[in-house]
């Protein structure tokens, strides 16, 4: 088995999908998790205005709405959370995503004071924080807020990790990589886009250029520039297609580099890192 085949197997990616079937499968998955854990009544998800959180949010709201209808339990709620650092440059996109999702509840927590306070505390202790490291603090602070909300509202936190993100390790460890449930896992970027099209999302929500936008000194840095490879190449690779040797080498480099992010903390029994 080639490395490409092994990665595809681990991430569960299909070369082609039926969007309606994947939508139904995901909604049923989200419903089943809450039904199994009767002490949970809510899903919590940060909404950025990008493709991934828009899709995960819409599917979560659909699942919650069906649960309420089927059980007559009004305690089931989907809580969308806006988590800007100061003023978000593409706030209009976030609002467009919320209008599409129509969440039961929307909360806004500005993480700037918490992030800046942490950076200042570290600097006071003599630890200088790089702009890149500060970006990771932002990602982790967003999850702190979401878990605080979930803890108060009998909730589970949804993550937006999908195959095209997982293969490159393009997420912050214990930041956006930390969640309770990953409804998009197995889908690549173009497949997620296909689901949003079927769901009737505004094209602007899935055609916009993906960016994590975590670094102050590199505002709007696109994922593809940061990774050095296009999502088209990543998606093709995940669908078992041939791509250029340069693109393949870049993808596989990120796969190896990000292995630690795909595991729980390492124990003496682990050997994947050796």
Swiss-Prot record:
Pathway connected to this protein: Cofactor biosynthesis; NAD(+) biosynthesis; NAD(+) from deamido-NAD(+) (ammonia route): step 1/1
Catalytic activity line of the entry: deamido-NAD(+) + NH4(+) + ATP = AMP + diphosphate + NAD(+) + H(+)
EC number of the protein: 6.3.1.5
InterPro entries: NAD/GMP_synthase, NAD_synthase, NH(3)-dep_NAD(+)_synth, Rossmann-like_a/b/a_fold
Single GO MF descriptor: glutaminase activity
Function: Catalyzes the ATP-dependent amidation of deamido-NAD to form NAD. Uses ammonia as a nitrogen source.
Subunit structure: Homodimer.
Protein name, per record: NH(3)-dependent NAD(+) synthetase
Native organism: Streptococcus pyogenes serotype M2 (strain MGAS10270)
């Amino acid at each position: 088995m080639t490395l490409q085949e092994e990665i595809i197997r681990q991430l569960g990616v299909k070369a082609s999908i039926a969007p309606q079937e994947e939508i139904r499968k995901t909604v049923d998955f989200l419903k089943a998790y809450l039904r199994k854990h009767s002490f949970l009544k809510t899903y919590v998800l940060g909404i950025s205005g990008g493709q991934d959180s828009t899709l995960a949010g819409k599917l979560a709201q659909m699942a919650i709405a069906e649960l309420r209808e089927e059980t007559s339990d009004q305690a089931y709620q989907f809580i969308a959370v806006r988590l800007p650092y100061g003023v978000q440059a593409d706030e209009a996109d976030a609002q467009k995503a919320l209008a599409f999702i129509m969440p039961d509840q929307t909360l806004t927590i500005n993480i700037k004071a918490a992030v800046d306070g942490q950076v200042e505390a570290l600097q006071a202790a003599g630890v200088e924080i790089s702009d890149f490291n500060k970006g990771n603090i932002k990602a982790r602070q967003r999850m702190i807020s979401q878990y605080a909300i979930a803890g108060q509202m009998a909730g589970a936190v949804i993550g937006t990790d999908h195959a095209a993100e997982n293969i490159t390790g393009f997420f912050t460890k214990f930041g956006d990589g930390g969640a309770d449930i990953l409804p998009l896992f197995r889908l690549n970027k173009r497949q997620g886009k296909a689901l949003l099209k079927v769901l009737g999302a505004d094209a602007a929500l899935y055609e916009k250029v993906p960016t994590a936008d975590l670094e102050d000194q590199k505002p709007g840095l696109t994922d593809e520039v940061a990774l050095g490879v296009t999502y088209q190449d990543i998606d093709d690779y995940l669908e078992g297609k041939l791509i250029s040797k340069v693109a393949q080498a870049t993808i596989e480099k990120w796969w190896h580099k990000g292995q630690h992010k795909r595991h729980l903390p390492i124990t003496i029994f682990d050997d994947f890192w050796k």
